[in-house]
A protein has these predicted regions:
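Hydrophobic, helix-prone linear segments
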Residues: 1-47, 79-82
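A glycine-centered beta-loop-beta connector
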Residues: 27, 35-48, 88, 96-112, ...
Length: 261
């Protein structure tokens, strides 16, 4: 399997001379974390929501050019799946542009696309605890949504577990939840303001979870069947960590020893 078999085609993009506010609107509307940036029709890099979220709407003359991450890797459609998967899981942007021989954008490859080839990558049968992240950014149901949204952007997270005082997981709130319900513009609201909203109003409950000693294949099946990207990990009914699609790909045998070169 090659990149051309699984990549997303006709991707959204922005030009280096377009305004940052326009790029941000596209990312909010489609719940994207990043967008390819073009210069004279060729890929110049990536712009991320994390980089531009704090550009105020009053600064309408700020262009994309000043925020381009030009050092991001690119792929071509003929690159094999193992190498492509390795590159995607080791990039901070989460999505990698796919270009033709003239450096023109022909697609995007994301972690979700990589999952289409998961059987070919030979996922190991190991406990979730071996690949989960143990230090988890969490929120509580009474937390102000503006602060939670800001944390998601700052740490580059697609969702946070919602826990009670006993560290029991009672729900999940995702960037998609925030965007779909129209709260993606509140990052500058005051927690004490009249328009403040709490997590409990939009969180999904009960949360989908896995146990620390479950096989990582159980988590992979959940991601595939439920189309979600992060799952809290429990040990003795308490939050012990979190596992995401990137962790799943890192646990594939085929990637062991693969390099980006």
């Amino acid at each position: 399997m090659k990149v051309g078999d699984i990549m997303s085609t006709n991707p959204q993009s922005v030009d280096v001379n377009e305004f940052v506010t326009h790029a941000r609107e596209i990312m909010r509307e489609y719940n994207y974390e990043s967008l390819p940036v073009l210069d004279k029709g060729k890929v110049a890099g990536i712009i991320t929501l994390q980089d531009i979220i704090n550009v105020t709407s009053t600064r309408s003359d700020v262009t994309v050019n000043g925020y381009v991450r030009s050092s991001v890797p690119v792929l071509t459609p003929d690159v094999g799946l193992p190498r492509a998967a390795f590159i995607v899981v080791h990039t901070d942007e989460g999505r990698v542009p796919v270009v033709d021989s003239s450096s023109r954008l022909v697609g995007l490859l994301s972690i979700n696309d990589i999952f289409k080839g998961l059987p070919e990558l030979d996922l190991m049968d190991v406990p979730v605890s071996e690949y989960m992240t143990k230090k988890v950014v969490v929120c509580q149901p009474e937390d102000n949504l503006s602060r939670v949204w800001a944390n998601m952007i700052e740490f580059g997270l697609t969702g946070l577990p919602v826990v009670n005082m006993k560290q029991e997981v009672i729900g999940m709130v995702t960037r998609g939840d925030v965007v779909k319900r129209g709260y993606a513009r509140i990052e500058r609201e005051s927690p004490s303001g009249k328009t403040s909203t709490t997590v409990q109003k939009i969180m999904s409950t009960p949360a989908v979870t896995v146990e620390a000693d479950d096989s990582i294949k159980v988590a992979a099946k959940i991601f595939t069947e439920r189309n979600i990207g992060r799952v809290p990990v429990l040990y003795k009914n308490k939050l012990a960590g979190i596992i995401d699609r990137f962790d799943i790909i890192r646990a594939c045998k085929v990637l062991q020893g693969v390099s980006a070169k």
